[in-house]
Amino acid sequence: MLKLATKLAPCSRVVYAISKPSILVSANQRRFNSSTPNDTVYTSLNDENDPQRDAFFQYTWGTWLKDDKEQKQKRVTRFSIEGVNSLLAKMYDTSRETMKSSNVLTAPVWDKELKATLLPSNLDLDTMGVLNPNEKIVVTQMASIHEGKHHRVYKLDTNTQKSFVLRLPYNLDGDFYNDVRVKSEAATLDFLRLKLGMKVPKVFAYGADAQNNALRSVFTLMEFIEGDLLMKRWNPLVKDSEGSQEQLKSVLDPLADIQRRLLEVTFTKFGSLYFAHDVEESLRKDLPYKGEVDTMLVNRWKIGPSAERVFYRDGLPAEEVTKFTGPWKNAIDEVVAVADSALNSVELSLQKDLTQEQETILNRAKEVYQDFRSVAPVLFESDLTKSSLPNGTELFLPRLHVPELDPLNVVDNTAGPYLLDVEGANIKPFILHGYPVFLSYDGPKIYNVNEDVEGYSEMSPEEQRSYDVMYMRTRNQFIWEFALNARCRELVGAVAPAVKMIREPYLAAVRRGADVHHYLNVESSLLALSQMWDSYRAGHLVGAEKFPVKWAETEEAFNQKVQRHREDLIAYQTKIASAPFSATNGWVPQDMFNTLKEQGIIVQDGEDYVIKDE
């Protein structure tokens, strides 16, 4: 009989047991302080269709004011518990075979019955534990320990006293992306552990093709790592005081150390890492990097299409997406691909049934991405012998980029920090990496509020607070840059002011989300770059004599462009200012949602919710 938790506390750790009814464990996570108790029900282990199981797979950490049912449906992580047990049984049997050749690194193995890939070399006695004669390995307890932005994580305990992590992606960007990302993530973690000797979880098995694999869900089964997230110590808005620098560096230094390791290997192409059997035959002949002396590693990984999320955001079919995902021999080709992908997305959206307002906005976005497409091929000087950029060759070499480098994805284990998540990891030149997302800030740089902000001392506390936040975010970036300089001095040119401005249209396009108004960020960066183009060309930082769009040819045309951009930006800012929770696309943490609903501040409006007017 299976014990499940329902009416889940927001952001709580939910556990149910498979065996005798045992004590239900619920340990609240720090991120939200919920004290809502969990109710329990039971389900038969032999009945996959028992509706009692359903609540365990539902998304519970928040509610959307608009399209809540649709958003939550995308985040349902239903999987076959029976399939998990079948997978564990195969892993257990494989571990016994591995014991016979413990010193041999074997290639990943495709299991025809499970329709999944196993990594035999990671399966041993220590991993799987020991069973009594005639006993089968089974899951005895499951815990939902994390509901993230893009995936959900379950902890599985077994009757061998060993625990595992089951990681399931949400279906936010379509089946094809989930298949791509799970294959690339597994290979990237394997590469980091075996080639670079980094602390990452071992991958035991992974499966794409949710319709056919044993779990009936795209999944990764991996090592469970004990410890606290670095996020527990991360306070980006801590005020300057004795010990504040040390507090910030206690998080940023371990992350900078991880980044230094990620950058050690330079590759032969731009794209993403995969196991050899997961890429097309034509891509298997090329080595991912040069100089490998370990014969067991030589053909283990290959470079295939980029797994960066920007190419997959629209949930398009494979044949539509793969036109843009590489792999590429030249760095600038990836920049062009990002522009082409963004433009393609807008053009496909224009074919839908639209309101006049939607069509107008999309046509504006199309104009901007066409401008970016014109600039992309010459965004940087291709002849690095002419460029005034220090260490330009180093900055343009293919290096591993992990977008999820974040204190939320690093566990402080007794053995040291472990990087848990490499979703969307890709190979691109360091000059195009940008800041880690948790440090990103594009506003005014303030290094000292009293010196850089006129009249700061006479401002009200509320006004001062706005500038304080700008200062703190600038300070955090500066600490990160200092850490980069200490560890990778040859790459510090990537944070030069000119380089930041040149690459910003590209980074803005990479960051584009579901809101089509993101074109305004791309346009803003293009406008700023156009004004500095001649200066940057003099130093051979950019690749064309003149900024390659027509509105930059005359002062009148440029001013008209600026005015139109300003009007669009004001209209958009006015719109989102009147939309509650616009920064989270209408998502409200569940504890907060429950409180506001009880207070009558949030009220139901059909299938949506609205904020009640005073």
Swiss-Prot record:
A Pfam family recorded for this sequence: APH
Gene Ontology cellular-component annotations: mitochondrion
Transit peptide: 1-39
Keyword vocabulary terms for this entry: Mitochondrion, Transit peptide
Subcellular location(s) per record: Mitochondrion
Principal localisation: mitochondrion
Domain of life: Eukaryota
InterPro entries: Aminoglycoside_PTrfase, Kinase-like_dom_sf, Mito_inheritance_9
Coiled-coil regions, chain positions: none
SUPFAM superfamilies given in the database record: Protein kinase-like (PK-like) (SSF56112)
Family: Belongs to the AIM9 family.
Protein name per its UniProtKB record: Altered inheritance of mitochondria protein 9, mitochondrial
Species lineage: Eukaryota, Fungi, Dikarya, Ascomycota, Saccharomycotina
Encoding gene, per UniProt annotation: AIM9
